[in-house]
């Protein structure tokens, strides 16, 4: 939440300020610089068919796709609790690949990176998993340890700033070494 969608618990599936901000920055920059999708919008894009059609929303960058995504995100928010939305999101996203094996979902990533079930990981390990999300294959600790450490620590910074963890937990997690191999 602290890294992917700071307003997750207060929005209704979309956050218009984020959408407009990213639209503006992307137009000015002439390319995609920043995303404005909420966790719920990302879930809509990844999982759901539009109006029970076979055709998925997909990942094409079009205004019509974004409108479909917004509508579905609102419907998802009306149908599910925030906890269920977060669970579905974490179980459906891509965490990269190790030895040509794709890691879809947080449980698979936890098993492949740490050799643990998701319930067994600690704060530093969980923060590393979340740190993978913006660019999984460019942040795996076995291939890109500096980037993985930097991004993991940014996740911890965000969590501390938002009050999700205390100073002791923050300091302990930042001291933990990254895994050297899967």
Region locations from a protein language model:
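Peptidoglycan glycan-strand catalytic modules in the bacterial/periplasmic cell-wall system
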Residues: 1-166
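Non-catalytic structural connector segments
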Residues: 166-182
